[in-house]
């Protein structure tokens, strides 16, 4: 089975728009990180033009990655000005690391 990582970088205020579709797609898990950067939107009131954004990372199967990326991209008309980006990255190996109870 092949795995991929779906990465979406969007304005931090758009989390409410993305939350429900992610739950509806029954993704195995999601990591949300706060990041700073600029793209189409440049914040002229902050150093380097950076604005506050969020980065979502979802590890999933190759098949489900296409569905997730398409769903996130379809929400573009509901997002804050400047939108964001969605990417699918191949994952060479995925290991679940956790402590097992004795």
Regions found by a protein language model. Name each.
Residues 1-102:
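Positively charged, small/polar-rich N-terminal and surface patches that mediate targeting and assembly
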């Amino acid at each position: 089975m092949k795995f991929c990582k779906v990465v979406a970088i969007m304005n931090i205020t758009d989390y409410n728009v993305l939350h429900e579709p992610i739950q509806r797609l029954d993704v195995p898990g999601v990591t949300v990180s706060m990041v700073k950067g600029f793209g189409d939107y440049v914040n002229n009131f902050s150093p380097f033009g950076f604005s506050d954004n969020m980065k979502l990372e979802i590890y999933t199967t190759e098949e489900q990655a296409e569905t997730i990326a398409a769903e996130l991209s379809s929400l573009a008309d509901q997002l804050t000005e400047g939108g964001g980006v969605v990417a699918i990255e191949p994952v060479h190996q995925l290991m679940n690391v956790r402590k097992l109870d004795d």
